[in-house]
Amino acid sequence: MAVVTMKQLLDSGAHFGHQTRRWNPKMKRFIFTDRNGIYIIDLQQTLTYIDKAYEFVKETVAHGGSVMFVGTKKQAQEPIAEEATRVGMPYVNQRWLGGMLTNFSTVHKRLQRLKELESMEQTGGFEGRTKKEILMLTREKNKLERSLGGIRDMQKVPSAIFVVDTNKEHLAVAEARKLNIPIIAILDTNCDPDVVDYPIPGNDDAIRSAALLTKVVASAIAEGLQARSGLAGGDEKPEAGEPLAEWEQELLASAVATTDEASAPSAAATETTTEEG
């Protein structure tokens, strides 16, 4: 069974790229056409690349690896936290702090400080201190929690990272590349595919698209964890969105018809506009 369907991708708006004046020419091979000044991403390729990324993530986790989720733009923050938490993986959905990967030993010391402050608060360690001292310690704890809470249990650099919007997360991408950590990423039409090991061509600005593709990666992790523990079971499938427009229904029908002749459905195209972050 497919990891994700053409209809789910269409429902989420994954096919909408950026305006044609805002693009990276290196993404040309992933573009199907353009409509009303908006590039339309080739979802047939998206399905193929999703399968490749899914298999890589599943095998990485099955063999004991971990995947860090990175997405600090507003549209990605909630799904990044929810899906990473669902499968027990580290995540960054606030500001990326320089050195999170390349200087992890220092970051790990800050994590120890966070746990120390939390322990003090829970075991009465704040008692006997002045109100000013308690306020300063609480502020320090809250600041560390906000910036490092998603990686609080990370003991070493991850085996791979999953990124929503490689342009916005260029610092994370640069650090991962410096350490030769594989990068899985949603690639919109304004991104550079050369910096990514496992690209997933798609809309990284729409909330539903980012959520769907993040959920797919988390499901690959869940399956990898099951394989690691010797358990059998299927992955959780992403949910479909709102009803398709008539032209999208025709596109879907065309893709379904093509399935009998090829291994993957064909992608076609669109009107409307994209949500841009």
UniProtKB/Swiss-Prot annotation:
Pfam families (alphabetical): Ribosomal_S2
Keywords: Ribonucleoprotein, Ribosomal protein
One cellular component (GO) term of this entry: cytosolic small ribosomal subunit
Biological process terms in GO annotation: translation
Residue stretches of biased makeup (Low complexity): 257-277
tRNA-binding found in the keyword field: no
GO molecular function: structural constituent of ribosome
Stretches the record annotates as Disordered: 255-277
Keyword Ribosomal protein: yes
Family from the record: Belongs to the universal ribosomal protein uS2 family.
Name the record gives this protein: Small ribosomal subunit protein uS2
Species whose genome carries this gene: Mycobacteroides abscessus (strain ATCC 19977 / DSM 44196 / CCUG 20993 / CIP 104536 / JCM 13569 / NCTC 13031 / TMC 1543 / L948) (Mycobacterium abscessus)
